[in-house]
């Protein structure tokens, strides 16, 4: 589990391999664990995370939008650079 410095996001790097990483995003009402059965099927590093207000990632404000979810993903990708 990794906590992003610039936000309260929590993400997980799994199945670490040398190939291009894959990002898996769960749906509303779920969390990163939904992907556990599929992780080992990939020959790539897999990045999974909990979207805002789900799993181990708290809400950052009372109302969130699709823009907030997009920003969250961009922040997580930046964190990996």
Name these PLM-found stretches.
Residues 47, 51-81:
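Active-site loop/oxyanion-hole signature of alpha/beta-hydrolase fold enzymes
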Residues 11, 34-37, 41, 68-75:
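Alpha-helical elements of Rossmann-like donor-binding domains used by nucleotide-donor carbohydrate transfer enzymes
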Residues 1-3, 27, 61, 65:
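Pocket-edge positions in alpha/beta enzyme catalytic cores
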